């Protein structure tokens, strides 16, 4: 019998959660997606591990329910879109995204956290610059398992690394 974990995909808005789930993890290409209302749930198997993903919509009102989703999960993947990060830098949405991340960190306490830097095939800012400019390196001092992986659902880069990261959680 395979072990199983539950993982929440979370971000402030349209960072690529559903695309990561369907094109990246499920391998379904050219999926026509609309903004998620509520959540999507899908399960995949990787190296004997059953991984159930909850793709939570970024709409207003859903954020207030984050505690309910986080309570029943084993890990959180927080997505940051590297293709629009410069555009957001001067807008409140960008600031709100990182404020949301800080709130999530307070809620999840010692739950494993992976930051997925998405859409690197269209990136405008390097992962190094994202980490430094927005002080993500301060998250490394957390007591729980933490990581940053850059990925592209379209090229497949980083997808297996995310799955291996999740698989390693169960081994420890």
Residues covered by each model-derived region:
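TRAFAC-class small GTPase G-domain
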Residues: 1-172
């Amino acid at each position: 019998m395979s072990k199983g974990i539950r993982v929440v995909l979370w971000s402030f808005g349209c960072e690529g959660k559903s695309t990561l789930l369907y094109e990246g993890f499920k391998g379904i290409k050219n999926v026509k997606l609309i903004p998620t209302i509520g959540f999507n749930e899908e399960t995949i198997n990787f190296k004997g591990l059953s991984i159930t993903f909850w793709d939570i919509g970024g709409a207003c009102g859903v954020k207030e329910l984050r505690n309910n989703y986080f309570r029943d999960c084993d890990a959180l993947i927080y997505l940051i879109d590297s293709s629009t990060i410069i555009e957001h830098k001067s807008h409140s949405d960008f600031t709100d995204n990182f404020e949301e991340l800080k709130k999530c960190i307070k809620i999840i306490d010692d739950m494993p956290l992976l930051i997925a830097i998405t859409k690197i095939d269209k990136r405008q800012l390097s992962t190094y610059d994202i980490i430094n400019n927005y002080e993500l390196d301060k998250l490394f001092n957390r007591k729980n398992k933490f990581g940053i992986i850059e990925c592209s659902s379209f090229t497949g880069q980083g997808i297996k690394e995310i799955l291996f990261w999740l698989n390693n959680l169960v081994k420890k």
